[in-house]
Swiss-Prot record:
<keyword id="KW-0749">Sporulation</keyword>
<dbReference type="GO" id="GO:0030435">
    <property type="term" value="P:sporulation resulting in formation of a cellular spore"/>
</dbReference>
<dbReference type="GO" id="GO:0030436">
    <property type="term" value="P:asexual sporulation"/>
</dbReference>
<comment type="similarity">
    <text>Belongs to the Tlp family.</text>
</comment>
<feature type="compositionally biased region" description="Basic and acidic residues">
    <location>
        <begin position="67"/>
        <end position="76"/>
    </location>
</feature>
<feature type="region of interest" description="Disordered">
    <location>
        <begin position="27"/>
        <end position="76"/>
    </location>
</feature>
<dbReference type="InterPro" id="IPR017524">
    <property type="entry name" value="SASP_thioredoxin-like"/>
</dbReference>
<protein>
    <recommendedName>
        <fullName>Small, acid-soluble spore protein Tlp</fullName>
    </recommendedName>
</protein>
<feature type="compositionally biased region" description="Basic and acidic residues">
    <location>
        <begin position="27"/>
        <end position="49"/>
    </location>
</feature>
<dbReference type="Pfam" id="PF19824">
    <property type="entry name" value="Tlp"/>
</dbReference>
Length: 76
């Protein structure tokens, strides 16, 4: 039998993912500012941060969806 869709902690889990991603971005920005990197390493780090930014946007959107679903579930 399939597991039921348990969405109880999705918002909290997503918020933790946002915090973790922001921390990684900050660490990467610190490295870019203070460490000597060759052009390839710098480009890879900048590209990673661009992907992280896209992930943050997706997380924020998903948080809104989950909060809306939670409100709708409470109204039922």
């Amino acid at each position: 039998m399939a597991n039921p869709d348990n969405r109880n902690n999705n918002v909290e889990r997503l918020k933790q993912m946002v915090r973790n991603t922001k921390a990684k971005m900050e660490a990467a920005n610190e490295a870019l500012a203070h460490e000597e990197m060759n052009a390839e390493e710098r480009q890879r780090t900048e590209e990673k941060n661009n992907r992280r930014k896209q992930s943050l946007d997706a997380f924020e959107s998903e948080i809104l969806d989950e909060q809306s679903a939670r409100i709708n579930d409470d109204e039922v």
